[in-house]
Amino acid sequence: SVEKEYRLLYPLLKKRAAFLFEYGHILHKQQKPEESIRILMEAMKYSSDPMILNIIGKNHQQTGDYLAAERWLIRSTYRLPGRIYPYYLLAKLYAEPDFRQPDKLEEMKQIVLAKAPKIYSTAIEEMRREVKKIK
């Protein structure tokens, strides 16, 4: 498996931010949030990429630790305020049945819908379409 390959490469590449991010992201996609968090915490030593924070937040959301997810995602918005993606993730977090926060949800939806993107993409269109569906 891909995860096994990354595990074998880890001793050689454990100080490379891009490798650690990809490894952590793969673990996240494989529903292994605790392992993913551990690897991504290492990646933070070598990179200030806010995507690391976003994936850590998504991992905490997977485990049901919504307050930790919120903290990491808010931290991502501080790192690069111009990015729309962390606000989109916060909107989805605030829509979680066990963490529902209608006021914060509306605030994040408005940011996603109104914020001018630095670079327009189909991903932005998709996020905006999806956020409109969230009730």
What do the PLM-derived regions correspond to, one by one?
Residues 2, 36, 69, 104-105:
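Single-residue signature of alpha-solenoid repeat helices
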Residues 14, 47-48, 81, 117:
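Short coil turns that delineate tetratricopeptide repeat
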Residues 30, 63, 97-99:
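Structural motif corresponding to the intra-repeat A-B loop/turn of tetratricopeptide repeats
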Residues 78-79, 84, 91-120:
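TPR/TPR-like (Sel1-like) alpha-helical repeat modules
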